Structures are given as C-alpha cells and as structure tokens.
Amino acid sequence: MTFKALHARDRTEHLGYGVFVHVLTSSVDARLAAFFEAYDAAFILDDEKEDLAGFKACLDLNDGAAYARLSALYGPYREVVLMLTRGEDGPVLGAANFIAFAGDGASLTVSLSYIFVDSGQRNRGHFSRLIQLVRNEAKASFAWPGDTPEPLVFIEMNDPVNMSPEDYALDSAHAGLDQVDRLKIWERRGARIVDMPYRQPPLSAQQTADSDLLLGVMGAPGESLDACLMAQHMRRFFGVTVLKGADPDSAPVAAEQLARLDAACTRRERIGLTGFERIFEQAARVPRDRTAPA
C-alpha cells in the first residue's frame, strides 16, 4: 500500500448530547466563517493571531500543486480545523486547528496551533474532547503502512515570565484565565516543556516574531526527544503552517532555530523535557496583574 495522506475526511458527526464536530480541511468550506468568528473572539494578541486569509492560505496547501511540492519535501501532511457546535448548525462551543505530519510513516508529529473553548462553555468537558479529537483525527488522516503510531502533540504556550506586563494583563483579562493557570491546565494533561529556546516566526509580513512562548509537547514517552525528530518536525511546521509554503531557511527566525537543531542532530543529541515547576517558581517572582476575571 502506498503511504499517503487521506484527502476526503471533511465531515460533520454527532458526538452525542447535541454536540457536533465539524472536520474542515478546505479553504472554500462555508463552515470556516463560523470557526473564524469564534476564533477571532477568543484570541486578542496581534502577533499570535492568524487572519482569515492566513487560515485559507494554510488550508490551500492541503491539495493540488502546492501539496505535491511540499509533501515531496516534508512527507504527507494534513492541516485540519475541528469545530464543536451545539446542534449541527448551532453556536460554536470550541475549536482547534492543527497540522499533522507523518514523515516516513514511522512517526506522527502534530503542531496544535490553536485550541479554545467559548468562555461560556467551560468546565463541560469540551477541552478534553477537543484534545482527544485532535489525536484521533491526526492518526486517521493517513494510510499507515504498518501500526498506527501515537502522536507527539506540540503546543505553544504563553510564557508568563517573558510576556510584557501589558500583554499579560490584556490576554488574561480577555480570556478570563491567568497565564499560570493556563499552564496548569496543560500540566494536568501530561504536557512537558521542551527545553530549548523557541520563537515563532512572523505569521505574515505585517506581524513580528513571537518570543514570549514556551514550546510544550504531549505524548512523549521519556525524558527527552531525539534532536533529529525535533529538527524534522520544526522544519515542516515552519515551512507549511507558519510560512505558508515558503522556504524556512529564507526566514531568519526559523533558519536560526533550525540550524541549532540540525547541529544537535548531527551530534546525535537529545532535547530535554522538563516539568513546569521551574517556570511556576520564576513566574511567582515576577510582579503581574493576576486578577483575571472569572
């Protein structure tokens, strides 16, 4: 069997109790407008946000000549939007956007770009449901040559130590959730912090790089990750999702990080994974407005 991505998985499913999941992989899907409206209301910091054109540009890379070119470089991949609604055509409860990379068929890595639950729908299991849907959909997006691997799911998290006081207060108030409390949500779900400097390259020509982020991972079986696997995944993520198909070596922020990872790969090093204790201790020493409304 030829190893490939499966391109016909867009659908709507009833999950029970009136909750529906919508799976989107096309920029012309009419449901994308509802997703973007909810997404745009959930995120407020300019340099972390995609505009609608950015999402469409990413989804356009799932097919045609662009997919043929990029999959030849990076292997099979799928960019996916998942959206939960109350009723098939009802209000958005939450959503996630991710890209899954299958590499050579032996591993599965995922970058979870965005995940959110509507502020009025929290504590109802929607976040956990979305996380599981991301894992399941990533695995089901490819015709695997052998056993289906469990995914490594990479996440970007706001760094409560490096964020400016203004961004910290604005984002916490907008979300109704303190930055440290957000990290605790990821910690409870088994996430680890990838022990390496991380900067997200600019998402568009109008934006700047985001250095106020921590890179985390869920699903890692040990205390470290192979540097070669990290280099491959980050090159794919930067090249497809962040830079919309452009060469990551042509973007200085991406190229600098990839050069470090490539060198670590050459030396056969491993990238350590840590818990959240150190960042919590550091955050406790930084004066912040931690009065985000409930």
What are these regions (language model features)?
Residues 1-42, 143-294:
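Terminal substrate-recognition subdomain of acyl/acetyltransferases
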Residues 107-110, 125-129, 133, 177-181:
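Short, well-structured alpha-helical interface segments that form or flank functional binding sites
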